[in-house]
C-alpha cells in the first residue's frame, strides 16, 4: 500500500532468508538472526558502474508489488526508466538555463512519473546494454550527456535551435539502445503503455514519507536534495511514527523503497551488515567509496560486524543535525523486504541491494 522514502539510520541486514531459519551475516560471524517477515522479491540485479540505484531499487519494489497484487513475476527494465528520465531531465536542464542538478542520480518518484508518462517494458525487451557488456558502465555516457546540455546552454547565439533535442536522443539511442514502440512478451503484443496496464500497477496508489524538523509534520514539502530535480514532495511525519509505518507495512506484506546513506562508517556491504555502533571510531576503513556508491567501496574492519554490539539510540534531533550538516545524505537507493531479529532480540531490516549479490 505504501511506498516509503527516507534517510533514517537503520540496522540493516543484507541477506534474503526463509522464515524459521537461523542465519548469519557472514562466515565466522557470531550474529544469529531469526526471520520475522521476508517479502517476496525478484532476483538481485547489478547497476554496474552507474548512478542509477534509484531505478533499480524502485523497480524492485514495484516488482514485489506486482507479485503481491497477483500480477505474476516480471523482471522490468531499469534502463528503460533511465532512458526516459535522462530525456526529461535534459529538457528541464535546458529550460532552467543550466540551473538544475544534472547527473545520473535520481529519486524514486522519477520511476513512478516515468511509468505514468511512458509506461514500462520487461528487462528482456530493453536491456539498455546494446554492446552486451558484462556490466553497465556509464562513465562515458554521463560525461557526454553533461557536455551536450552544457554546450546547448552556453552556446554563444541569441536563440536555441531545435536541433539539440534529436542530437541528444541519438546519443541515448547509441549508448542505451532505441526504445521499443511495440514488442512481444509471453506470446502477446504490447506497447509500453499497454504492458503497464496489464500489470495492474497504479503509481498513484503509493506515497512518499520522510521525517525532518525543518518543515511542519503532517504536511507535504519538497525535499531539498540535489537528486530531487523534479522538485517532488514527500509527506513529513515524526521519526517514531515513520518507523511505525515501516514496521506496519512490512508486517503486512508491503515492502518499501528506501533512500539511504551508505557512506556511514557502520555500513559494510562486505560484512552484509549496516548499523550505528556507539563507537564508530573503532571501525578501520581502507580505500574509499566511488562517487556513485555503485559497488562495495571501502573495506571496513571492526568487531561490530562479527558479533552483536551496543548501538546509538537515534533521536529526531540527531537525525536532523546529520541532514543539516550534510553528514547524512540520500546517496543510495535500496529495497527493504523484511525484518529479522538477532539473538539479543534486536531488530534489523532485510535489504535488497543492486550491487549484483
What are these regions (language model features)?
Residues 21-313, 320-357:
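Catalytic-core signature of thiol
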Residues 1-22:
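Bacterial Sec-dependent N-terminal signal peptides
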